[in-house]
A protein has these predicted regions:
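Compact beta-sheet-dominated domain cores in extracellular/mature segments
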Residues: 2-108
Length: 108
């Protein structure tokens, strides 16, 4: 009887764990860039699949010199909210110069 109850509790716990929604998958590592004033800035362990408007940047004053030290591909956009036709895809480990301007990023 005791084994039956223990087995039932274990199966119930497993089903509950599978039913609870998980948080967004986080990318491991740092995404670094420079603001329009040249200050170093970055995002640590960003969530995947969610657009991030980069602090210290805007469409009128975008950041530059992105470095993708995360484990995921980063797509950087010139405009906020990951919108617009101007974007660039950065594989993990990619470093780009000050000619690439950005205001938002999404990781995949």
């Amino acid at each position: 009887m005791r084994l039956h109850q223990t087995l039932g509790a274990a199966v119930g716990a497993l089903l509950l764990a599978l039913a609870v929604p998980t948080s967004a998958h986080a990318t491991t590592g740092d995404f670094l860039y420079k603001t329009s004033t040249g200050q170093e800035a970055g995002v640590a362990d960003p969530a995947s699949g969610r657009c991030i408007d980069l602090p210290g940047t805007s469409g009128d004053a975008p950041g530059h010199s992105p470095r993708n030290f995360t484990t995921s591909t980063a797509t950087v956009f010139l405009e906020a909210d990951c919108e617009g036709d101007t974007y660039y895809v950065m594989k993990p480990g990619t470093k780009l110069g000050d000619k690439l301007k950005l205001s938002s990023v999404v990781f995949s």
